[in-house]
From Swiss-Prot:
Heart, brain, placenta, lung, liver and skeletal muscle. Residues 19-38, 43-89, 111-130, 140-354, 879-911 are annotated as: Disordered. This is Inner nuclear membrane protein Man1. The chain crosses the membrane at residues 475-495, 628-648. It comes from the Eukaryota. Pfam families: LEM, MSC. Residues 217-236, 259-269 have a biased composition (Acidic residues). Interacts with SMAD1, SMAD2, SMAD3 and SMAD5. Binds to both phosphorylated and unphosphorylated R-SMADS. Residues 63-89 have a biased composition (Low complexity). The lineage of its organism: Eukaryota, Metazoa, Chordata, Craniata, Vertebrata.
């Protein structure tokens, strides 16, 4: 029968296979060539499990602990076949079915105050319909293993909600205790908790079974019979979530809007109906506490509730096959965990301290099929439970493959944060995919954008590091180019000269002309050998000389004859014939005959005194050294030439710049000289006692400081020459002053009308440059003191009382201001600064508006406020100044130009 059942699925069509899986409560994806074998295998397993459950009947469940087969008292024998059928059909047991919580040692004693908490209650009599808890068959990244995820668990359907189970700071649902309350007695002995671990929390509300629900765990027997033969790596899970250390999931209504990708939008309508049903059930799920401590491995703390078992009781075996199927976005899951912690419509998770426990590094064998999805709602679990999760798809029971894990006691504020910082690897087919962060307990919970950014960088860290950056690419290209040119140069240096072929023969096509045509062949061969020997000897000697290892470059005729005689007596007789052929040939054959002088012409062999090679034979390193020296020498010469050109250009540029600067200074000096002469002429008109001319040295000394006179001598001479040649208003005369003759300048006064129209008088206000507003004037007066800039040019001022004209101009401009009590002119200021003190800030503000932005003597006047203490520190005499200052006369000379210009404008407009 089993064989028939095994072969039957192979003959099913795609539609029949889909309907069969739907009949078992599964929701498969599209049937393709890659998914069909997996679906057939799953259907075969479901049928075998169904047959085994029918054979087992009401027998107690068996365990599959490969380490120790000590069997705890079966607590689900009375659960009946309904639960077994529900487990086989993929239906999760109701939260009220708590028969699996009973252990022989009094484990998990349940308060009797809840009449509906046992099987005898109303909830134990009804069976959950199979259609109420479909599971969705999905695939891992390579579609090689099947993952099943309860659709009604997340409330969103598809991968949107399957992905949220693993990283929400929660643990997957627990395995039924009927299947997992078996542990190795030795392991229980080793995992005996410390004395302070046994602290109990007050008992929580008693468990109540919602009406219409019935629990059953009899499917464990069928699994127990064939569990030893099953390969954990090839066993496909039926459920996608499982508790690690007995965590309790937060109600799923908080997660129904979670979306991990945009590929599962078509399942939202179907999954929303599951959400409504699941929400109605989650409202009635009570929480309970154990009255006896469990071993550390089975410690379950819902937000810090410590649940441990006695030493004699079994440990809680945990299965996490497909602990979080399809979880694709870690950061989204952590955001859901944060939402669950805040309790927005969800059960509040207790955050009491989690005790320190230790997990032995022993891998447990697969025990039972995965627990049903709503089982965890009746168990208290710690969101800070930090056991590792085995994410192998066919991994079977919970296994701890890494060395021992320790969990420190967490404060209440860090209990949930610790669980949210747990990282689980999603690689379903790697040898070891357990990740555990060292700073799990101490890492603070980050905000959602920070956590999402952190997870993105985490993904980048595990990505392959074989990317070739642009920096290394540039270095590689540069190195390749350098190597190319280096090899090219070395190849060039290693090449032979063009005069000698590669096999060493002389580069003479026909060494014997018509003159030697009658020579016998044997003599020709002997003569050629003689020339070869001489050529090699002379080339070696010349090469040694060029490389510096020998001081001799040439070989005398006697030495050459002795060398040939040492080689053989036959070469001695042919030596003269060879020399004659070299002289008669007239071509460069690599051997040169030299007489007593280097430029001596040779016509007979008797005149030949020395033999010299024209092609020195040098070693590779000698050639390289000579080439390096030659190239370096030429580069130095080139650089020297470039430097010389740059120096010449720089000097020319410097000369041009200096000439331009001297020309500009000359024109500035001319302007200053003209201003001095004009001002002196105006002063002479007012004061008839003054001479109408000025000595040229006196003008020079008034315009140029003593320390600059030597440097400015050339500029002054050019300015004097320019005035003599180009300025008609200045006349040069010779006058006797103080008994000595001096060259003087006299200003020739133009006509009065032209002066009034064209000539701008000195020390007068010439109008406003811009209007004052909030952008260039503060709305309130800050201090009673002002600092006025650009009122004068100290270089242009002549005499000792010129500062009085500046003070008079300020008082005339502010004639309507009766609050000015002190004016100080800084004669040495290059900015032409004048300081004014008023009686109050209001008077200072009035003066600010009158002076700021005005033209005075061709300069733009600017004003700013100055602190009173700094003003008194600079001018201590102003402390006692309280009398308002007034202009010395009523003519308002500094304002006359404004009246004149206004009058001219009006007259021109009327005409």
């Amino acid at each position: 029968m089993a064989a028939a059942a095994a072969s039957a699925p192979q003959q099913l069509s795609d539609e029949e296979l889909f309907s069969q899986l739907r009949r078992y409560g599964l929701s498969p994806g599209p049937v393709t060539e890659s998914t069909r074998p997996v679906y057939l295998k799953k259907l075969k397993k479901l049928r075998e499990e169904e047959q085994q459950q029918h054979r087992s009947g009401g027998r107690g469940n068996k365990t599959r602990n490969s380490n120790n087969n000590n069997t705890a008292a079966a607590t689900v024998a009375a659960a009946g076949p309904a639960a077994a059928a529900a487990a086989g059909m993929g239906v999760r047991p109701v939260s009220g079915d708590l028969s699996y919580l009973r252990t022989p040692g009094g484990l998990c004693r349940i308060s009797a105050s809840g009449p509906e908490s046992l099987l005898g209650g109303p909830g134990g009599a009804s069976a959950a319909p199979a259609a109420g808890s479909k599971v969705l068959l999905g695939f891992s990244s390579d579609e090689s293993d099947v993952e099943a995820s309860p659709r009604d668990q997340a409330g969103g359907g598809g991968r949107k909600d399957r992905a949220s189970l693993q990283y929400r700071g929660l643990k997957a649902p627990p395995a039924p205790l009927a299947a997992s309350e078996v542990t190795n007695s030795n392991s229980a002995e080793r995992r005996k908790p410390h004395s302070w671990w046994g602290a109990r929390r007050p008992a929580g509300p008693e468990l109540q079974t919602p009406p219409g629900k019935d629990g059953a765990v009899e499917d464990e027997e069928g699994e127990g019979e064939d569990g030893e033969e099953r390969d954990p790596e090839t066993e496909e899970p039926l459920w996608a979530s499982r508790t690690v250390n007995g965590s309790r999931l937060v109600p799923y209504s908080c997660r129904e809007n979670y979306s991990d990708s945009e590929e599962e939008d078509d399942d939202d309508v179907a999954s929303s109906r599951q959400v409504l049903k699941d929400d109605s059930l989650s409202r009635h799920r009570p929480r309970r506490t154990h009255s006896k401590p469990l071993p550390p491995l089975t410690a379950k703390s819902a937000g810090g509730r410590l649940e441990t078992s006695v030493q004699g009781g079994g440990g809680l075996a945990m299965n996490d096959r497909a602990a979080a199927a399809g979880s694709l976005d870690r950061s989204r899951n952590l955001e859901e965990a944060a939402a669950a912690e805040q309790g927005g419509g969800c059960d509040q998770v207790d955050s009491s301290p989690v005790p320190r426990y230790r997990v032995n590094a022993k891998k447990l064998t697969p025990l039972l099929p995965p627990p049903l999805t709503d089982m965890d709602s009746t168990l208290d679990s710690s969101t800070g439970s930090l056991l590792k999760t085995n994410n192998h798809i066919g991994g079977g029971a919970f296994s701890v493959d890494s060395p021992r894990i320790y969990s420190n006691s967490l404060p209440p504020s860090a209990a949930v944060a610790a669980s949210s910082s747990l990282r689980i690897n999603h690689a379903n087919h790697t040898g070891s995919n357990h990740t555990y962060l060292k700073n799990t307990y101490n890492k603070p919970k980050l905000s959602e954008p920070e956590e999402e950014l952190l997870q993105q960088f985490k993904r980048e860290e595990v990505s392959p590091t074989g990317s070739f950056s642009a920096h290394y690419l540039s270095m590689f290209l540069l190195t390749a180019a350098c190597l190319f040119f280096l090899i090219l140069g070395l190849t060039y240096l290693g090449m032979r000269g063009t005069g000698v072929s590669e096999d060493g023969e002389l580069s003479i096509e026909n060494p014997f002309g018509e003159t030697f045509g009658k020579i016998q062949e044997s003599e020709k061969t002997l003569m050629m050998n003689t020339l070869y020997k001489l050529h090699d000897r002379l080339a070696q000697l010349a090469g040694d000389h060029e490389c510096g290892s020998s001081s001799q470059r040439t070989l005398s005729v006697q030495e050459a004859a002795a060398y040939l005689k040492d080689l053989g007596p036959e070469y001695e007789g042919i030596f003269n014939t060879s020399l004659q052929w070299i002289l008669e040939n007239g071509k460069d054959v690599g051997i040169r005959c030299v007489g007593f002088g280097p430029e001596e012409e040779l016509t007979n062999i008797t005149d030949v005194q020395f033999l010299q090679s024209t092609r020195p034979l040098m070693s590779f390193w000698c050639r390289f050294r000579r080439a390096f020296v030659t190239v370096t020498h030429r580069l130095l010469l080139l650089c020297l030439g470039v430097v010389m050109v740059c120096v010449v250009l720089r000097y020319m540029k410097y000369r041009w710049t200096k000439e331009e600067e001297e020309t500009r200074q000359m024109y500035d000096m001319v302007v200053k000289i003209i201003d001095v002469l004009r001002s002196h002429n105006e002063a002479c008109q007012e004061n008839k006692d003054l001479q109408p001319y000025m000595p040229i040295p006196h003008v020079r000394d008034s315009l140029i400081q003593p320390h600059d006179r030597k440097k400015m001598k050339k500029v002054w001479d050019r300015a004097v020459d320019f005035l003599a040649a180009n300025e008609s208003r200045v006349r040069t005369e010779t006058r006797r002053i103080g008994g000595a003759d001096f060259l003087v300048w006299r200003w020739i006064q133009p006509s009065a009308s032209c002066d009034k129209i064209l000539v701008i008088p000195s020390k007068v206000w010439q109008g406003q440059a811009f209007h004052l507003d909030r952008r260039n004037s503060p709305p309130n007066s800050l201090t009673p003191c002002l600092k006025i800039r650009n009122m004068f040019d100290p270089v242009m001022e002549i005499g000792d009382q010129w500062h009085l004209a500046i003070q008079e101009a300020i008082l005339e401009k502010c004639s309507d201001n009766d609050g000015i009590v002190h004016i100080a002119v800084d004669k040495n200021s290059r900015e032409g600064c004048v300081y004014v003190k008023c009686l109050s800030p209001e008077y200072a503000g009035k003066a600010f508006k009158a002076l700021h932005g005005s033209w005075f003597d061709g300069k733009l006047v600017t004003v700013k406020y100055l602190r009173l203490d700094r003003y008194h520190h600079r001018f201590p005499q102003a402390l006692t100044s309280n009398t308002p200052l007034k202009p010395s006369n009523k003519h308002m000379n500094s304002m006359s130009h404004l009246r004149l210009r206004t009058g001219l404008t009006n007259s021109q407009g009327s005409s």
